[in-house]
Amino acid sequence: MPVKLDALESCGGASFYAFADYAPLGSDPWMSRTELPSVAAADGVLRLRFQQSLRADQGRDLRFVPRPEAALLARVAERLKGMITDAARHTTFAKSDAYARLRELLAGYEEARRRAVSLGAFNAIASARLFRRLGFSLPFVSLSDLLARDELLPSIASTLAVFIREHALVVEAVSEAMAYDERGELHFTRKESGHVPLAIAGAEDGIRRPLRLVMQGGDHLLVAGGETFNAGPADAASLIDLLQRLSGRWSLDIFAPLFLFRLGVSGIVNGRGSIRYSLVLGHVMRRLFGERHVPNLLCSCAPRPSGPLIDAVCHARGGLPPALRDYERTLIDRFLTNDVGTIREEIRVAWRNGAV
């Protein structure tokens, strides 16, 4: 993530970073846990969680997952302190500085806990604070809040209306694009008939479920789980009304970038995984709207496992444990073991040279 921020800032112009604060818990590992090299851990990996129970909250929209309790953050603090103490026994680094940075990190977590109403908000607040500490100055916004702004809803609804009206064409366009993926490298899921690029968090359980289109006479019914929403003619006006009624519960799916492009976003920074989707998104954009995909900047790197924490584990075990062979330094790792100037330089070199 930091390399993308650095690349985005280097581009200049009116750039911003949007937090997808509505993703379902468990859909990506980084939302469920943070992994760090640890001398004391059985496999060399310390796994931190910021929610009480992954099993209980699995699949829930992050806006509906409770914020971390104070007791949970206290356990995180103790584990991080122990990690630093153990590492200092096996390698040379400024332990007192690491403890000071840990106190600063934890102060940010506590502030985020006080201000947040959900895990999604906690992640956004804590991350934005840390990014600011590292000197990143571009705006950080909640994607769900941005897309729900009254002045943007007409464009969102207009684009959604096209997706619904041309739902068969969307399925066809996705299949056409995926026909080029002979080696199965896109990791893009084919879309079924009635696909709508919209998801809804369950009113009772907060589970994020995709909506699908079912026609009933002239009415367009959007169905998810046990809930059905009548979008009427599914024109822009009726969809604005529907989105306003579902405020705080709806979110866009993998086609979200196309909605942003239609709003006027003129470029995007992607990583190794997300840039592959551009083949499909670009084809859908052309078939559906007759427009080209906006410019992409691939910003990614695969650095070797490194840093004081890795050095400590290797020294203690006589080599790199299998669980850490694909480890990429997290921002927490960097922040605890380096000064801000060093971190920014490592980040700058990483995305320009492809590795640190």
Predicted stretch roles:
Residues 1-3, 7-356:
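N-terminal targeting/trafficking signals and adjacent low-complexity tails
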